[in-house]
């Protein structure tokens, strides 16, 4: 497993450059903000919460390339055959699951993805709780889906993963500001190219670009502190 550290701006550019623009994408637990790195020919959105789902249905009502499923991840993914999609995205998902369940989810993604998996998650456990009756970061009622239950570090991923991370001071994303991001945090992307993992791991990593983006790399943080 390889780990690189960047400033936030360089991290976003690096991930955008490394993601493969594939035809069929499974976007698990997307909430109201599905991945927007590229537009696939078929974008399958898997979202369990009804209020989020209605927003997605209204937003993509005229988009023939978007298929929306109301389902928890386990039921949806286990119904699919091996290598059913090109890419799987887990954007701010696994930290909302207990560690054992999150590990099972990642394993299912590895079974399904033909080409790549992308995971975006805070580095380590970052507490995020809500009081009864409080609204979530989108001003909606999905607080039970927004509680953090686990933390993840590069050591949770094997050698098939390319890990890149960035140190961030708070987090703001198009007007979405989560109250839990109130001090320095580290965010991590995990990217696995499934097409070569099993047979060409060593060669694959030797051939991977260095990731030296404009602005340069930053020092690796001590994520156990």
Model-assigned labels for residue ranges:
Residues 1-19:
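Class I SAM-dependent methyltransferase Rossmann-like catalytic core
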Residues 16-129:
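Conserved SAM-binding loop
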Residues 3-5, 74-78, 98-225:
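S-adenosyl-L-methionine-dependent methyltransferase catalytic module, highlighting the catalytic core
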């Amino acid at each position: 497993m390889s780990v690189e550290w960047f400033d936030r701006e360089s991290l976003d550019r690096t991930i955008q450059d490394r993601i493969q623009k594939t035809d069929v994408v499974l976007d698990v637990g997307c909430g109201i903000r599905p991945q927007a790195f590229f537009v696939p020919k078929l974008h399958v959105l898997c979202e369990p919460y009804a209020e989020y789902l209605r927003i997605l249905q209204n937003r993509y009502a005229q988009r023939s390339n978007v298929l929306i499923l109301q389902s928890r991840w386990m039921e949806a993914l286990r119904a699919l055959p091996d290598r059913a999609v090109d890419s799987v995205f887990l954007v701010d998902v696994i930290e909302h699951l207990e560690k054992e369940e999150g590990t099972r989810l990642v394993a299912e993604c590895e079974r399904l993805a033909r080409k790549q998996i992308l995971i975006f998650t805070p580095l380590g456990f970052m507490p995020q709780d809500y009081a009864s009756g409080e609204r979530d970061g989108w001003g909606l009622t999905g607080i039970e889906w927004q509680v953090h239950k686990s933390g993840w570090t590069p050591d949770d991923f094997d050698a098939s993963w390319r890990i890149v991370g960035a140190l961030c001071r708070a987090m703001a994303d198009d007007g979405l500001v989560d109250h839990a991001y109130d001090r320095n945090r580290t965010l991590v992307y995990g990217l696995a190219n499934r097409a070569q993992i099993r047979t060409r791991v060593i060669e694959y990593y030797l051939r991977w670009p260095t990731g030296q983006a404009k602005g340069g790399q930053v020092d690796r943080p001590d994520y156990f502190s």
